[in-house]
């Protein structure tokens, strides 16, 4: 089996890669049947020379590879007929901007495996960059709080060269003793954010304590879906019921918002779910929110202040709940919003290594042995949508 690592072609350029040079070396040494080559790239976080040093061929032509792996969507001009491609296609939610990409993939008889579709027997996703989205997003939230309050001043994440440097930078954080933080979600993203909260030695408390008690040290609460979504009719709720009938629910986040200074949103938002945070919530006299770090970054979605994505180099903008418009985040009654939609790109080396480690451990053995995980992950096969993704037929037509 020959694996080719693509040069990222989408703009703006992405520095990440599925495997680092050391990981390629490890794969080749542990799996005799696997060969790896890599396309040359001037933007990749690892240099071409680093791959050459460990015996990986650097080639422009990947036409003799069995599997071609990238990170972001592959430009149509880089798609090779009758090949197997792995990348984040952003098509399974029927994103209109990638409809043509999927149509061409089918026309070229490409077998497409999207990393998002790789799941275990229980339906749980096995791989993604969510952990580093959470880590960088939480760091950026504290960077935003420092710039909003002028208590401290952190270096922008993309100017740091590693996770170690980010951890070192966190030593500069100085927080008020009465600070309360909400973290939504319980998946990879939110647990990545939790790593940063724990690095800062911020105390985790219960939901009841968060609402009812005063503290003399910074504290946070981690909320799952049913903590901030309740049945409209007051009936007992369950996750199964919520995902089946989200229209029967309403947000109860206001119970927590009136106690919080920072909201870090790391939840997954399903279409049809209730809005989590509204203008009315933010305009309440009881509202203390100063910073919203929306790691999930659903534009015009559940968090009313997320009116556009921000960028890695300019991660902060202000939101005025009185006008529903962008404003100067340094003003007193303006909420500082962090809503970067490509957070892992700030630490591309660490994010790539973390991704590769998971792929090697959880997925590669199944791929080599042609196991059930990978056979279930294909979106397209032999010029058609697979049974699992037949629902995309109307989307592409």
What are these regions (language model features)?
Residues 2-104:
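An N-terminal-biased, well-structured beta-alpha scaffold segment characteristic
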Residues 67-149:
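Phosphate/diphosphate ligand-binding glycine-rich loop within oxidoreductases
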């Amino acid at each position: 089996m020959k694996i080719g690592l693509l040069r990222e072609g989408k703009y703006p350029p992405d520095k990440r890669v599925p495997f680092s040079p050391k990981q390629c070396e490890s794969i080749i040494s542990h799996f005799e049947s696997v060969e790896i080559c890599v396309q040359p790239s001037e933007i990749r976080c690892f240099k071409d020379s680093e791959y050459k040093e460990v015996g990986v061929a650097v080639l422009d032509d990947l036409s003799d590879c069995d599997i071609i792996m990238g990170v972001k969507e592959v430009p149509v001009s880089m798609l090779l007929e009758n090949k197997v491609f792995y990348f984040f296609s952003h098509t399974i939610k029927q994103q209109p901007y990638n409809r043509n990409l999927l149509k061409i993939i089918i026309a070229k008889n490409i077998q497409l495996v999207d990393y998002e579709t790789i799941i275990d027997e229980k339906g749980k996703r096995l791989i993604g960059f969510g952990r580093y989205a959470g880590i960088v997003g939480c760091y950026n939230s504290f960077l935003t709080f420092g710039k909003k309050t002028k208590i401290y001043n952190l270096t922008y994440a993309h100017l740091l060269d590693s996770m170690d440097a980010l951890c070192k930078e966190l030593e500069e954080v100085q927080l008020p003793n009465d600070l309360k933080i909400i973290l939504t979600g319980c998946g990879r993203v939110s647990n990545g954010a939790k790593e940063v909260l724990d690095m800062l030695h911020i105390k985790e408390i219960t939901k009841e304590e968060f609402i009812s008690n005063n503290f003399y040290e910074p504290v946070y609460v981690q909320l799952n879906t049913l903590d901030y979504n309740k049945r409209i009719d007051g009936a007992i709720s369950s996750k199964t019921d919520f995902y089946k009938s989200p229209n029967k629910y309403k947000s109860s986040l206001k119970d927590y918002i009136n106690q919080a200074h920072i909201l870090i949103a790391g939840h997954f938002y399903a279409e049809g779910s209730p809005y989590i945070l509204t203008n009315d919530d933010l305009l309440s006299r009881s509202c203390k929110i100063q910073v919203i770090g929306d790691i999930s970054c659903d534009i015009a979605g559940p968090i009313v202040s997320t009116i556009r994505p921000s960028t890695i180099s300019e991660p902060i903008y202000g939101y005025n709940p009185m006008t529903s418009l962008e404003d100067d985040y340094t003003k007193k009654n303006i909420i500082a919003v962090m809503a970067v939609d490509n957070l892992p790109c700030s630490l591309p080396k660490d994010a790539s290594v973390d991704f590769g480690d998971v792929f090697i451990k959880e997925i590669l053995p199944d791929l080599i042995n042609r196991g059930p995980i990978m056979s279930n992950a294909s979106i397209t096969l032999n010029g058609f949508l697979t049974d699992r993704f037949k629902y995309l037929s109307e989307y592409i037509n």
